[in-house]
Swiss-Prot record:
Protein family per UniProt: Belongs to the QueA family.
HAMAP family named among the record's database cross-references: QueA
Identification of the protein by name: S-adenosylmethionine:tRNA ribosyltransferase-isomerase
SUPFAM superfamilies per record: QueA-like
PANTHER family hit by this protein: S-ADENOSYLMETHIONINE:TRNA RIBOSYLTRANSFERASE-ISOMERASE
Biological role stated in the UniProt entry: Transfers and isomerizes the ribose moiety from AdoMet to the 7-aminomethyl group of 7-deazaguanine (preQ1-tRNA) to give epoxyqueuosine (oQ-tRNA).
Oligomer status and interactors: Monomer.
Annotated compartments: Cytoplasm
Disulfide bonds: none
Source taxonomy: Bacteria, Pseudomonadati, Pseudomonadota, Betaproteobacteria, Burkholderiales
Length: 355
């Protein structure tokens, strides 16, 4: 069994990308080919992605849109608070994290952004239910701030409001971006279309739990956060057509991967084929997992000891990912949300931990 320490590495802090590059496709792309030993690592630019995939392949994108989910405000007593919307649960209700000197009780009124009041409802650990006086999405968009990841050290500005969204984001509901998609611009998508690469979308609303650290050495004891996803019938049909013509299903980002594999695992366990699905998932993919749908993965470089590093290690192989990350650090790749990307291929032979 792998432990948390197996997924640790030393990352020079200056390699954590603090801002987006001027052009989305200006990022670098590390293509990882583990069909040879040792794995072949090819340094590319992201704009070269079309040369790495084939006509008839299917790219699966997550079309979630990041909410302006961060608010600063105060209690009736004048005490300062910070609120992060975790998810919208109804037209006028949402779940949120609240930072305050003392947790507010049910019935408490909070003033947000000096613009409107919300009422605290029941506690749904670790979140609070908030009741909004007008439709949540309207007030969030008008008065909230974009919630950048904790390792980005500046407050969101006008540039972030554009660059921390994918160009195809259309379904508001996330509190973090599906960052592998940030590298795609419209000209690149048009090039992929022209060469016969298929595209499809699903929705997974990324929650704040994506930044939750793993606090147990035995990773089997870690409990994943839950996120809502929607896998439409049009995507199911495109996956079937891709399989029929011998193409690859390529997930753009770990969120697309998690939604696809969650739906496929549920179908497998029920003894039925993949079908359109709307559900919650807390799928936790670690080495030894049997992948059912995804053949290749476009992804960014992830945090040490993170569940996403475990996911890519399960997909491409622990030793392959270790070698790729060593190479990326040596070659000064940019890491995390605004960083560079990798193109991985599924390893079909599970690895055992080293003695």
């Amino acid at each position: 069994m792998f432990t948390l320490s197996d997924f640790d590495f030393n990352l020079p802090p200056e390699l954590i990308a603090q801002t987006a590059l001027p052009e989305r496709t200006a990022s670098r792309l590390l293509e990882v080919d583990h069909t040879v030993e040792p794995a072949r690592l090819v340094d590319r630019n992201f704009v070269e992605l079309p040369s790495c995939i084939a006509p008839g392949d299917l790219l699966v994108f997550n079309d979630t849109r990041v909410l302006k989910a961060r608010f600063f405000g105060q209690k009736a007593s004048g005490g300062k608070i910070e609120v992060l919307i975790e998810r919208v649960t109804g037209t006028h209700t949402a779940l949120a994290q609240i930072r305050a000197s003392k947790s507010p009780g049910a019935g408490t009124t909070l003033r947000l952004a000096d613009a409107f009041d919300v009422t605290v409802g029941e506690r749904v650990e670790p979140f609070f239910t908030l009741h909004f006086p007008q439709p949540c999405l309207t007030l969030i968009e008008q008065h909230g701030r974009l919630p950048l990841p904790p390792y980005i050290e500046h407050d969101a500005d006008a540039s972030d409001e554009t660059r921390y969204q994918t160009v195809y984001a259309s379904n508001p509901g996330a509190v973090a971006a599906p960052t592998a998609g940030l590298h795609f611009d419209l000209p690149l998508l048009e090039r992929l279309d022209a060469m016969g690469v298929e595209r499809a979308t699903l929705t997974l609303h990324v929650g704040a739990g994506t930044f939750q650290p793993v606090r147990v050495e035995n990773i089997a004891e870690h409990r994943m956060h839950s996120e809502w996803y929607d896998l439409p019938q049009s995507l199911v049909d495109k996956i079937a057509a891709t399989r029929a013509r011998g193409g690859n299903v390529i997930a753009v980002g770990t969120t697309s991967m998690r939604a696809l594999e969650a739906a496929a695992r549920s179908a497998d366990e029920a003894g039925r084929p993949l079908a359109a699905t709307q559900a919650e998932t807390d799928i936790f993919i670690t080495p030894g997992y049997r992948f059912r749908v995804v053949d290749r993965l476009v992804t960014n470089f992830h945090l040490p000891k993170s569940t996403l590093l475990m996911l890519v290690s399960a997909f491409a192989g622990v030793e392959t990912i270790r070698a790729a990350y060593r190479h990326a650090i040596d070659q000064r790749y940019r890491f995390f949300s605004y960083g560079d990307a990798m193109l991985l291929t599924r390893r079909d032979t599970p690895e055992a931990p080293r003695a």
